[in-house]
Amino acid sequence: PFFFQRIQDSIEDFDGIIFDIGRGRYDHHQKDSRIRENGIPYAAFGLLWEELGTEILGEELAAKFDEAFVQPLDNNDNTGEKNELASLIGSFNPSWDEDGGTDEAFFRAVSVAGMILDNKFARYLGNERADKRIEEILETQNPEADSRILVLPEFIPCQKRLSETDIAFVIFPSNRGGYCIQPQKKEYSLNYKCSFPSEWLGLENEELQKETGLSSASF
């Protein structure tokens, strides 16, 4: 459990977390507040993440999380730059003429923010495991096999990792039975390395089977 208190000045010898005021470790409202090398100033969230992020995700993932998730929120906090997540959390604030409820609203916002962070952490760690699994599969791939097609034993998120390779298609078991074939995008692009024939577009079931010549083809 944790406890919080709103005060105007920091307490001498206090060993908890002081943020936003009193030149505490996470106060970002001073003239000499820190700014990242890319020009985005630190807010309390960024300063907290700088201290705790590596412990949660490891150094490499913590840096990626800071760039993709923390920095936009810090920028919103410091400049007012629009950010949908910041707006969502801010929507928990009571209306100006609503009696009380500030603490309750705060804890609801904390609960939602906590769930979002937990999900984000799980996704980052899961993607890291996926990248390692893909590396293992690539290392054991038959050198005589078509280098542009990769067959996976199970679904593994791999679009980003494989964008750096020549692999154009990935085949993996479908949770609906059979197999899925998925084209891979070019690095830093929304375009595929190799697309299916345009004649296949929009076709389903028997029409797709007739056009492809595959009796089991479906979309």
Where are these regions (language model features)?
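C-terminal accessory domains and tails appended to enzymatic cores
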Residues: 10-14, 33-39, 81-219
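N-terminal small/polar loop signature for handling phosphorylated ligands or for N-terminal nucleophile
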Residues: 2-23
